[in-house]
Amino acid sequence: MSMNTLTMIQIAEVFASYTLITLLLPWIALRKVFRKFTIPEQIMGYFLAGNIYVIYLVFLVQFLHISGRISLIIGSIVPFAVILYKKCKGHIPELIEAALVKIQYILHGEIGLKTFFFGRKDKKRERFTKNDIKRWIRYVPDLVLTALIVAGVCYVYGKNAVTVYGYKASDMPVHTYWVNLMDENHIFGAGVYPHGFHCMIYYLHAVFGFKTYVVMRVFGFVQTLFIYLALLVPLRGLCKNRYTPYMGTAIYLFGNFFSAQTYSRYASTLPQEYGMLF
């Protein structure tokens, strides 16, 4: 396997992991709470909730000196356990009885395991109405334009991310050193610093098993992609014209208005750029 291919795989893995913890899991936990807001507001809410929860979870377990993969995973599933308990509170005996009845049906061969775990298809079809189809069709132009912005980020920054294998800023080894010290429950090892960035890198390293230097090497591109999405989504919520946010983001993406250092910093995994996400 070539180094270019390996780097692309690593970028995809880190991107998927970061998306899971900052968008998908918050969506599962908070979608009913945020249902009353617009789509851009919901996305911003999920993203902020995911990042802030992970950062403060790492702070908590680090200060308690119990940080590790197990404690972080347990801390990550606590919100879902609380939500499930509140949802099922008072109905637990009924749920147990229903499960036992289904098990009895399985033993008698009346239903299969697929029906036991996923339910009947006709009930699911009833939930998906024509209005849902029309609602999703309405967002097709936004999805296409967002995909074009993502493709633009890959075009502008992707080649450098894939073909330059080392660190791209002189202070990245120091940040790597700080993150590695957190493996020993030693936070702020080289001084007090705005540590949310380090908490996120450490979480990706500890929970998903990535080497710290790998995350530091490829997260810069993932971070840059989310920076442009963090610019696009609020504009989509604020602008009356549907296409203005995409035009504005594209102009900033392809324009050359600032010094070269402004754009070169996007190639590195740096805390200042991580702060631009918020």
Q: Where are the regions a protein language model picked out?
A:
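Transmembrane signal-anchor helices characteristic of membrane glycosylation enzymes that use polyprenol
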Residues: 85, 138-168
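Transmembrane alpha-helix boundary and packing residues in multipass membrane permease domains
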Residues: 27, 58, 177, 202, ...
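Short hydrophobic/aromatic helix or loop-helix immediately within or flanking a transmembrane segment
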Residues: 190-212
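Membrane-interface helix caps and helix-loop-helix hairpins in membrane proteins
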Residues: 62-66, 160-164, 260-270
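Hydrophobic alpha-helical transmembrane segments
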Residues: 13-28, 162-173, 216-224
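Membrane-embedded helix bundles of polyisoprenyl
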Residues: 47-58, 146-154, 197, 219-238, ...
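Membrane-proximal lumenal/periplasmic loop motifs of glycosylation machinery
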Residues: 163-168, 183-198
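Membrane-embedded, hydrophobic transmembrane alpha-helices
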Residues: 1-136
